[in-house]
Amino acid sequence: MGNSKSGALSKEILEELQLNTKFTEEELCSWYQSFLKECPSGRITKQEFQSIYSKFFPEADPKAYAQHVFRSFDANSDGTLDFKEYVIALHMTSAGKTNQKLEWAFSLYDVDGNGAISKSEVLEIVMAIFKMISPEDVKQLPEDENTPEKRAEKIWGFFGKKDDDKLTEEEFIEGTLANKEILRLIQFEPRKVKEKLKEKKP
């Protein structure tokens, strides 16, 4: 990011972000100012990202989930995100287009980055999601998905996989597009994330 340390967001990045997200110019500029206050270097570390994410969910423990979100957007694995990657991360976890979102969801669940998802990786992400759900909301969940183990079992069952099978990106996206129930189960309710983003700018 050429002008990451200056006070204004470059026109190119602003236009690209408006094109790829639903955020307004005003929102993006005000977020950029906040971003520079929190991260004067123009880059955000995993710890800083977790800390900002925690502000959105004061009643929950989003650290594990935030860590996985961070990993999935740190394309060059350098341990930092720039403002563009940061905004796209917030957008994808709250609003992104279905296909884009599913590609991202695959990378979120592919914890070891080997291009396939195992049942244990599904459980790891679902456990992180459960830490984001309040105990009251957990009580409202159906009996067959009210623990991380049950929910992971249900997701894996929808794909018709054996315990030691792997799931490719194509299978993951096709299966999820074909079954709205899987889509609901694999994500932390984006509506809630969206509400939080509107309530509290980073």
UniProtKB/Swiss-Prot annotation:
EF-hand 2 and EF-hand 3 domains are the low-affinity and the high-affinity calcium binding sites, respectively. EF-hand 1 and EF-hand 4 domains do not bind calcium due to substitutions that disrupt their respective Ca(2+) binding loops. The cooperative binding of calcium to the EF-hand 2 domain following EF-hand 3 domain calcium binding requires myristoylation. Calcium binding to the 2 EF-hand domains induces exposure of the myristoyl group through a protein conformation change, this process known as the calcium-myristoyl switch facilitates binding to photoreceptor cell membranes. It comes from the Eukaryota. Pfam families: EF-hand_7, EF-hand_8. One of its GO terms (molecular function) is calcium ion binding. Homodimer; disulfide-linked. Homodimerization is caused by prolonged intense illumination. May form a complex composed of RHO, GRK1 and RCVRN in a Ca(2+)-dependent manner; RCVRN prevents the interaction between GRK1 and RHO. Interacts (via C-terminus) with GRK1 (via N-terminus); the interaction is Ca(2+)-dependent. Acts as a calcium sensor and regulates phototransduction of cone and rod photoreceptor cells. Modulates light sensitivity of cone photoreceptor in dark and dim conditions. In response to high Ca(2+) levels induced by low light levels, prolongs RHO/rhodopsin activation in rod photoreceptor cells by binding to and inhibiting GRK1-mediated phosphorylation of RHO/rhodopsin. Plays a role in scotopic vision/enhances vision in dim light by enhancing signal transfer between rod photoreceptors and rod bipolar cells. GO terms for biological process: phototransduction; regulation of calcium ion transport; regulation of signal transduction; visual perception. This is Recoverin. PANTHER family: CALCIUM BINDING PROTEINS (PTHR23055), RECOVERIN (PTHR23055:SF20). The N-terminal glycine is linked to one of four different types of acyl groups. The most abundant is myristoleate (14:1), but 14:0, 14:2, and 12:0 acyl residues are also present. The Ca(2+) induced exposure of the myristoyl group, known as the calcium-myristoyl switch, promotes RCVRN binding to the photoreceptor cell membranes only when intracellular Ca(2+) concentration is high. Oxidation on Cys-39 occurs in response to prolonged intense illumination and results in the formation of disulfide homodimers, and to a lesser extent disulfide-linked heterodimers. Keywords: Calcium, Cell projection, Disulfide bond, Lipoprotein, Membrane, Metal-binding, Myristate, Oxidation, Redox-active center, Repeat, Sensory transduction, Vision. Belongs to the recoverin family. Residues 41-59, 61-96, 97-132, 147-182 form the EF-hand domain. The record marks K192 as: Interaction with GRK1. Ca(2+) 2 binds at D110, D112, N114, E121. It is found in: Photoreceptor inner segment; Cell projection, Cilium, Photoreceptor outer segment; Photoreceptor outer segment membrane; Perikaryon. Ca(2+) 1 binds at D74, N76, D78, T80, E85. The modification Cysteine sulfenic acid (-SOH) is found at C39. GO terms for cellular component: membrane; perikaryon; photoreceptor inner segment; photoreceptor outer segment. The keyword Calcium applies. The gene is RCVRN. Its main location: other. It is a lipid-anchor. InterPro entries: EF-hand-dom_pair (IPR011992), EF_Hand_1_Ca_BS (IPR018247), EF_hand_dom (IPR002048), Recoverin (IPR028846). Residues 189-192 are annotated as: Interaction with GRK1.
